[in-house]
Amino acid sequence: KLFHGTIIKSGKNIILNINSTFNEKKVITISPGGFRGFYMLGLCKYLKENYELKDYVFSGASAGAWNSLFLSLKENDDDFINYIFDIDYTNVKSLQLIEENVKKAVLNNYKTEDFKLDKVYIGTTVWKKFRFHTVIYNDFSDLEDAINCCIGSSHIPFVTGNLFYKYRNLLTFDGGFSKYPYVDGKYADVHITPSYWEDRKKNKLSRPANLNIKDYTTLFSKKEHDLKIMYLQGYEDAK
């Protein structure tokens, strides 16, 4: 069996690999963003502090997958941020090494029950039966399984790792390779990108922001960007 949990085939070549229904839930979608995922982390931190999110689920791909995981954390957000930035990123040049360090930090300090994983929907692009499919996962067995899915959702061959990455024995690639790697096959009313508050400063949480080319310009390079500064800038821009 290639997939686990409840399998729902929807339109747009999307397979939902989930444990729970989302039809009655509000959705926040979070885009890919490369290293600027740290900027989106600042946005998400502000959201958690200032908006009631208990009725929302979080659907993201690539950097958006990691931020969806953060949004599902039950408490102690400040500790989580501190653990992430206790990592020395000075000589870390690739997203793969960043992901490995973040995975280690999270697993060393948290357990599965510290997160509401049933609220997390991670978009991936899977190669199966000689074609690409968008696969959305929600049926995580534990925290490590969810993190491994985040890594798969962020995998770009030869950029974030080796040529292939397998998640649940399937060749898995960056969810950003899919047009709409989100739970209902479209952007939600709240769609977070690295340029979200730049475009919506006067209209918070209203309607989707269109993807901006700047969302992807720092995908492969962080040499001009301090990750902590990007996080702080995202938090400040959200105010």
Residue ranges of predicted features:
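Patatin-like phospholipase
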Residues: 1-59, 69-239
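Gly/Ala-rich beta-loop-alpha elbow adjacent to hydrolase catalytic centers
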Residues: 60, 64
